[in-house]
């Protein structure tokens, strides 16, 4: 994905037009923009929302490990969980279709009633690892890291905007930049 500041700015403004509002919308929508832009196929089947079933977010593991169904019900009641609407808008713009099976009612029902321990012990997503052992023998399996963090460097790449002319209020966080985008205070000439 591009690291050029001008390209970043144009892409973030475009994501805003497609519905990005929150920091997570911009940081998670950014790679999806490039996936759909470069996708040769007409349909993308994604794993968006999968982590919610396993309750492996920081918040989930700290506060809801023993109340996993409450955690899931809260997540999946949000019609835009995992930036679903933004992803559908990006797909539509590029005349593509997106299929998000982990957000389907059937998948939500399939996970209903499962516990954190049965899904994640002795390893994160152990239930999936055990059901597809032959496949996972062939690849390196890592623990969960948010899409926009870790080795993707998506979020850290965006921090360059704090040094440029979009930082009109001397923000310390890129969230301020996203708020300026939402208020229509920044643009590209």
Map each language-model feature to its residues.
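ATP-dependent adenylate-handling active sites, centered on carboxylate activation for C-N bond formation
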Residues: 1-130, 134-135, 150-161, 188
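Peripheral terminal appendages
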Residues: 64, 138-189
């Amino acid at each position: 994905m591009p690291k050029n500041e001008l390209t970043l700015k144009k892409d973030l403004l475009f994501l805003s037009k497609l519905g990005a509002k929150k920091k997570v919308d911009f940081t998670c929508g950014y790679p999806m923009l490039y996936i759909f832009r470069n996708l040769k196929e007409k349909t993308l089947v994604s794993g968006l929302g999968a982590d919610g079933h396993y309750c492996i977010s920081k918040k989930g593991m700290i506060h809801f490990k023993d109340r996993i169904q409450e955690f899931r019900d809260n997540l999946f009641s949000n019609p835009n969980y995992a930036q679903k609407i933004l992803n559908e808008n990006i797909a539509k713009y590029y005349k593509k279709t997106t299929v998000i099976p982990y957000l389907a009612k059937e998948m939500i029902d399939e996970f209903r009633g499962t516990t954190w321990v049965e899904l994640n012990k002795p390893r994160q997503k152990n239930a999936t690892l055990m059901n597809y052992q032959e496949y996972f023998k062939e690849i390196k399996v890592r623990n969960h890291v948010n899409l926009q963090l870790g080795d993707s460097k998506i979020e850290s790449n965006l921090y360059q905007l704090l040094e440029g002319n979009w930082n009109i209020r001397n923000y310390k966080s890129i969230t301020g930049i996203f708020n300026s985008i939402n208020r229509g205070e920044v643009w590209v000439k």
